[in-house]
Amino acid sequence: MSNIIYDESITIDSTKTNRKTVDTSRNDYDNQDMVDKVDAVANIIMEGKKSKYRDVFFPELINSLDLKTGVEIGVDEAGFSSHILTKTKIEKYYCVDNWMDEFGSGINMRKSKFDTSGDVRYNNAVSLLSQFGDRAIPLRMSSMEAVTKFNDNSLDFVYIDGDHSLFGIYEDIKAWTHKVRIGGICAGHDYKDGSGSGINDNFGQQLPYRIKCVTDDYCRKHGYKLNTVGGLTLSWWFVKNKEA
C-alpha cells in the first residue's frame, strides 16, 4: 500500500523551501554572470552525446546546481517524475496533475484523451512515487490551484508539461516563474508549435500546440535566455536571473 496520502486540505509551507536568497539591490549583483555560470555547467553536461536528451540532461543539471525543491506540472503516470527522483538528490518534488478522465482545452472543446480513467492513472502514479517516501508529493489539482500553495521565489526547479494550448501554456509559465527563486530553473516539455494528438475541437479537428511561440515570446519579453535540449521532442529551459 502506498505511503503517500493525498489530502485535499493540504497547505504547503513553502517558506521552508526557500534555501537561498539573493540581494538583487547589491551594486555587485550581476544577472548575466549568473546565467553564464549555469551555461558553463550546462555546456559541460552537453558534452556527452546522451546528455543531449532530457532524461540525462535535467537530472545532471539538478545535481550540478544542487537544486533541492521542484514541481512538475502534468505528471500522468509519473514516469518522468520517478526518473527525476531516482537520478537526483532533490529533497521535495511536488507532482501536480488533475488526473482527469478527459482532457479539455478552450470553450466547448472536450475530447476523451486517455485509455484509462483518471483514478486509475492517479493510483498508478501514487504507487510508483511511493518508493520515494516523503520526497514525492502528488497534488491532484489543477496547475492554477496548485500554484497558489507556493510562495513566490520558493522553488529551485519547475518542469511544465500540462495544458499545451495557447492560453494554458502562457498561464503556466507566467504563474510558475514567479514561484521559482532567482537563480532557479524554469523548464518544460514539447517545445514546438503545430498539431497535438488527442486535442480536438467539436468537429474533430486537431487543436494546435502553441508552446514554442508562447515560450519564445515570454523569454524575449522578460529578457530570459531560452535554451533547448533534445529527446523525442525538445524541452525548453531558462535560468530565472531576474524577476519577470
Predicted regions and their residues:
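S-adenosylmethionine/decaboxylated-SAM
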Residues: A42, D55-A244
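Class I SAM-dependent methyltransferase Rossmann-like catalytic core
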Residues: I4-D66
